[in-house]
């Protein structure tokens, strides 16, 4: 049960305005990363991209008697998301960053991405399934996020997971260039690793 109480905090990334009744994420450790793939006629000649929310903080509100009554809220600012493509030139990376901020995330109009849980359940062993509502660019969709957690020798909890979502579900039109000969795929792959204590 102690494992479950602690791990419910794991998906709280840059949380604000949320009660800290449980363990908290260790700042400046771990990552929250989104992989963006390209397609289209000349998609094979284009670069895939990775973007990352590099500041990870937050805590959980935990019900020790019933894990399903625990709560998770995830909030991080869109302005803190960075393009981390190591193979791109600084100029190209800056252009991708600008496109992401102005056309995809529209950070001035939508400064936050929010995840708020609606249910937590065990999935056997060290697995959890966290259901909730994800809000991007003001549009909310239900999601389910699976995660795996491990207790380290010093008591720190390490958790990681992967999930995917479609940009179009949140009213985002995938970027296209060259008349659609190169375009960003609608589905984005997301992975995270978080440490808390």
How should these model regions be labeled?
Residues 1-7:
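Bacterial N-terminal signal peptides that target proteins for export
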Residues 19-197:
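Low-complexity, acidic/polar, glycine-enriched regions of mature
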Residues 14-16:
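N-terminal signal peptide c-region/cleavage motif recognized by signal peptidases
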């Amino acid at each position: 049960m102690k494992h479950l109480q602690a791990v419910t905090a794991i998906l709280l990334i840059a949380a604000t305005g949320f009660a800290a009744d449980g363990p908290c994420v260790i700042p400046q450790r771990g990552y929250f990363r989104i992989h963006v793939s390209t397609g289209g006629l000349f998609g094979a000649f284009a670069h895939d991209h990775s973007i990352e929310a590099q500041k990870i903080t937050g805590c959980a509100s935990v019900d020790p008697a019933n894990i399903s009554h625990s709560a998770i809220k995830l909030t991080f600012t869109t302005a803190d998301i960075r393009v981390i493509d190591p193979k791109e030139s600084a100029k190209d990376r800056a252009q991708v960053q600008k496109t992401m901020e102005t056309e995809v995330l529209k950070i001035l109009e939508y400064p936050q991405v929010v995840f708020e849980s609606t249910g937590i359940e065990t999935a056997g062993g060290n697995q959890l399934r966290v259901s909730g509502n994800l809000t991007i660019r003001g549009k909310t969709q239900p999601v389910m996020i699976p995660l795996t957690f491990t207790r380290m020798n010093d008591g720190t909890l390490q958790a990681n997971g992967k999930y995917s979502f479609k940009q179009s579900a949140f009213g985002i039109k995938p970027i296209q260039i060259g008349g659609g000969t190169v375009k960003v795929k609608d589905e984005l792959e997301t992975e995270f690793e978080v440490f808390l204590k």
